[in-house]
Amino acid sequence: MALPSAGEDVVRETKTPWWKGAQGEWYVVVQAVLMLLVLVGPRTLPGGPEWSLPYVPQRQMVGAILVAAGGAFFLAGLRRLGSALTPLPYPKEGASLVQTGPYSLVRHPLYSGGLFASFGCALMVSGWLTFVYVAALFVLLDIKSRQEERWLSQKFPEYAAYQRRVRKLVPFVY
């Protein structure tokens, strides 16, 4: 195997098996598990506290609005990303840096949309364990986005200016 020349994609060139996670595969697996838990996971632990929030129609409405808004933001991000879309955090070969549409509000609108929708689900089901899943998902996506941003910074010199200008996950906040 020849050594890659300057500018070549070293990770893809080495043909690392997917299960070693060289392109962030394990982030995607854990993310899928956490999102599945948010949707259909247990709401409390066996023998644990039976805590759940009392039914409040306003909380249900806020949850539904967050699910709809998060889903719409996610879909807008998918659409804007277009052919650069990949399930992995490693940037797709030949992709360009997208900074318009939802990407002008946050650097990771797919993650943001998923988080807002997940928090909305937690509000609607009111089980304490669902809030734990959402918190774990937030931590995972924050860590995943840091790795993704290292790769994006290597691929796109203009990414540093974009980072200074646009928040990571929550518009105008974080």
Task: List each language-model region with its residue ranges.
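Solvent-exposed interhelical
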Residues: 95-105, 110-111
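Membrane-anchoring alpha-helices and their flanking helix-loop junctions
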Residues: 1-99, 116-174
